């Protein structure tokens, strides 16, 4: 009896590599930004960098942007795919904004030259549990909600699990693609799904995807093992502290440690 073939793993838009390939296309990049921010009437992209690493001169800590884009009005967009709810998205957005400012403000320029920027996180979960499909944040005076501080910076979160709020037809299509929901009636969704299907079927592209996933599994396994070791060390330290607090003999503590090795 022949064994049934295992179903191939499908790599969707939320995969880092797939998302990077999609965003390398200027046409896709423009369409996605226009879908998220239709009110800006963006007509052209003049510069984009995909999987762009930034390490500030004053710091050893760098950040990798999934996609950094500049339009013809000199506005900047940082577009990130977020698949894990780390509960620090506010700080993450703040950090990304600061790095965009550092990257775009030339040495010697004053803050007056800061460009308008949009930090966009496409999330596979509802980051704020209000059910909105599109969250947008600005700074307001605490007691006067009509008074907005114009920092020329914007934070947006696209919630693929949301059901509330009016959004563009294009953004609805992007959300369908994130959820791997076929939507042939939506032009943008149909186009993106076809490209993603090609990446999954092309042998060379698929090999790169599988290699990337294997590296992620290795790194996760190493991280988990390291975490277990650190937890074990903390437990031993706490036990030793407890022994000492109860005036245990040193020989007894050594015997305990010997039994654990």
Question: Which residues make up each language-model segment?
Answer:
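Short, charged alpha-helical interaction segments and adjacent helix-coil junctions
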Residues: 1-9, 17, 77-82, 168-261
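Accessory alpha/beta interaction modules
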Residues: 1-154, 164, 222
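Upstream accessory/linker segments immediately N-terminal to the RecA-like ATPase cores of bacterial MutS
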Residues: 143, 150-164, 173-184
